[in-house]
Amino acid sequence: MKIKTFNSEIRIPHSEFERGNNMSNEIWIFAEQQEGKVRKVAFELLSVGAEFSKKTGSQVAAILLGSGLQEAVKSLIPFADRIYLIEDPALVSYTSDAYLTNMAPFIKEHQPSILLGGATSTGKDLFPRLATHLQTGYAPDCTGLATEENGKLVAKRPLYGGKVFAEMTFSEARPQMATVRNNTFLVNQNINKSAQVISISSHTDPSSLKKKVLGLEKAAGTKLDITEAEIVVAGGRGIKAPENFKMIEELSDVLNASVGTTRATVDEGWRDQKDQIGKSGKNISAKLYMAFGISGAIHHVLGIGTCKTVVAVDTDPNALIFNYADYGIVGDLFQIIPALTEELKKAMKE
C-alpha cells in the first residue's frame, strides 16, 4: 500500500497476495443489513461503483449475508449487476467469526478488484479482519474515492484529527479494500440495473462459533444517530456555554430531530464526540440541517455536503456558514431559538 500526504510518500510493506487465474475485474460492495434492511451507505457505495464501472468497464456486485433477506435483495437489484447472497440463520446478526468464515474464502476464490463497505461499527470490525486474512491493503474511514482507468483505487481519508488528508493507493494485492463514512456520497436512484442473484452455500458451523447474538434491544428514549436523522439541529461555539444547549435540545424535541455539534464544542468538553459533524466527526445527509452559532469552518461544512436544506443563524453577517446555507438569519440565537420553539409548538397544536 502507498500513502501520499502533501509532497511526501510513505511506503507500507505488506505480504504479497498470491493471485491466481480466478482474479475478476468486479467491484464488490458489502451490503450491510440490519434486521433485513440494507443500510443507506451500501447504496451510496453501489452508486460509486456504478460510476467507477463507466471508467473501468467493471461489473458491480453486492455481497449480502443474513437470513430472510427477500426484501433486502429486492432493494439491491436495481443497483448491481450481481448479488452474491449467503443466507443462514447463523448470519441473522453480525458476528465477526461467522461473517469472516463465509466471506474470506469466497473473496479469495474470486478476487474482486475492489471491495468497499461502510465505516460502520460492523465495517470497522470486519474489514481489518478480512484484509489480514487475505493479506491485502485496507484504507479505513475514507471520505473520498476515485479510480483510474486501469482499476487502481485511490482512497482519501483524514489523518491527525482531520488536520491533513492522505491519498492511499494499493500495490498488486487484491482486493483493494476501503471503508467509507456514511453520507459521503449521494445515492443515484437512476442506475436501473437488473441484478442476477447468485446464492452461495453457507460455510457456517454453529458449533464452532465463538460468539452468538442472543437478541437486540434498542435503547429507550434515545434519538436517531445524526448520520441517520432526517432533521439535525446543531449548536457551535456561539452557544457560549454547555448549559445553553438546553435550548437546542428543546427545539430538537419539538422537531423530532437529532442534535449535532462542532469540533470546537467537543474540544471544550461541552458535547460528546459522537455528535460531532465534520471531517474529524461524522457526515450527515439530513433533509433539514439547522446551524446555530456555527461560523462555518471548512472542517465542519465538509460534513454537511449532502444535506438537502441548510438553515443558518449567526450574529456575524460575514460568517462562512452563510455561503453554504439555503436560508440565513443574521441575529441573536438566544432570542431566535426560544421564539422558534414556541411558534413550532403552537403550529403543531393547530
Where are these regions (language model features)?
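Short, basic, low-complexity termini and linkers enriched in Ser/Thr/Gly/Pro
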Residues: 1-19
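N-terminal glycine-rich FAD/FM-binding segment characteristic of electron-transfer flavoproteins
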Residues: 19-350
